[in-house]
């Protein structure tokens, strides 16, 4: 394999710092653990990685445009603290005709717009929970949803805006939650049928012939009594809390062959329906009656060596450096003379 200069692109914004003087650039800080892990894996694979940082300023975009790399490993999830702009960053790279890993601007936009993604799933015959989209003063695509429901921002990811209070069992709770979403996120609210069941994640690798990785389950059974079994903000981000500490991912051993096949086929179908590239993760709910529901598609899953995606890849026989190297190879193959 040719030794490549690969820019590991990540986002960082001034709001993560203490208050800064007007007109000054954000302070430097070490990259997050997943960014550092990808950097080290690329180095181990014989490449020459360099860090590229987007901090929400025009200057950082100019620096990115002038950076000299053979490929950009795109780990950006936001721009200037706005996580709805990851597709704009991909679009910027596309306009610069830069080669980069992962899904392009179109696929990122489709996955970000949860209501649009669900309509695409329905068109392709992929089962997803019933839903309605509520704008200020207007409801769109209202299906016959019954309580309990879960209410979330229509265009956020990473469980942002999804707390335990997002699960509503009455009209009063529902209206309060819709008002919260409108006020806090200036976003339409997505009301979705709440599916009680197991939380399963299926990673997908590939482009022309995508491969579904073994399913990983997030164990929500040990959440404190009275809390809904959802992977909300408390579970994903609030380190040190009981909810965070008691939810662990593992490789389930009790999924029968038919279910594994259905998970794999549906994951690949959803991956392709939203035009994902190279890698991605499909989030499912498995109901008690065996029904499988696609909750959402994550085109840029957390790539830390200990996270769910790498866990599934390891089960499929790939070391972490091999996984990172395969993502590089998949990206290069999408471009003319990709390996040169």
Report each predicted region and the residues it spans.
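Short glycine-enriched, charge-decorated loop/helix-capping segments at active-site entrances
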Residues: 22-28, 163-168, 310-312
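ATP-binding N-terminal substructure of ATP-dependent carboxylate-amine bond-forming enzymes
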Residues: 1-101, 106, 111-112, 116, ...
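Phosphate-binding site of ATP-dependent enzymes
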Residues: 171-265, 288-293
């Amino acid at each position: 394999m040719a030794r490549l200069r690969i820019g590991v692109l990540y986002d960082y914004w001034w709001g993560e710092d203490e208050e800064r003087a007007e007109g000054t650039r954000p302070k430097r800080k070490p990259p997050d653990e997943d960014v550092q892990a990808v950097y080290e894996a690329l180095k181990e694979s014989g490449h020459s990685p360099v860090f590229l940082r987007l901090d929400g300023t025009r200057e950082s975009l100019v620096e990115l445009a002038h950076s000299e790399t053979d490929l950009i490993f795109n780990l950006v999830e936001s721009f200037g603290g706005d996580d709805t702009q990851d597709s704009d960053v991909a679009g910027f790279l596309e306009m610069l005709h830069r080669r980069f890993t992962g899904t392009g601007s179109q696929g990122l936009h489709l996955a970000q717009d949860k209501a649009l993604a669900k309509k695409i799933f329905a068109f392709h015959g992929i089962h997803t929970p019933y839903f309605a989209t509520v704008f200020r003063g207007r409801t769109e695509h209202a299906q016959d949803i019954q309580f309990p429901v879960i209410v979330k921002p229509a265009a956020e990811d990473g469980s942002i805006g999804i707390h335990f209070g997002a699960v509503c069992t009455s009209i009063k709770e529902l209206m309060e939650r819709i008002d919260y979403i409108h006020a806090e996120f200036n976003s339409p609210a997505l009301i979705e049928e709440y599916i009680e069941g197991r939380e399963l994640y299926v990673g997908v690798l590939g482009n022309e012939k995508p491969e579904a990785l073994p399913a990983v389950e997030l164990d929500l059974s040990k959440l404190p009594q009275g809390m809904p079994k959802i992977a909300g903000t408390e579970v994903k981000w609030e380190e040190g809390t009981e909810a965070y500490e008691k939810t662990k991912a593992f490789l389930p051993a009790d999924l029968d062959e038919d279910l594994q096949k259905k998970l794999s086929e549906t994951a690949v179908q959803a991956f392709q329906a939203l035009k994902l590239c190279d890698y991605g993760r499909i989030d499912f709910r498995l109901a008690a009656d065996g029904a499988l529901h696609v909750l959402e598609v994550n085109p840029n899953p957390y790539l830390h060596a200990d996270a769910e995606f790498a866990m599934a890849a390891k089960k499929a026989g790939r070391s972490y450096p091999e996984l990172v190297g395969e993502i590089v190879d998949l990206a290069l193959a999408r471009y003319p003379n990709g390996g040169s």
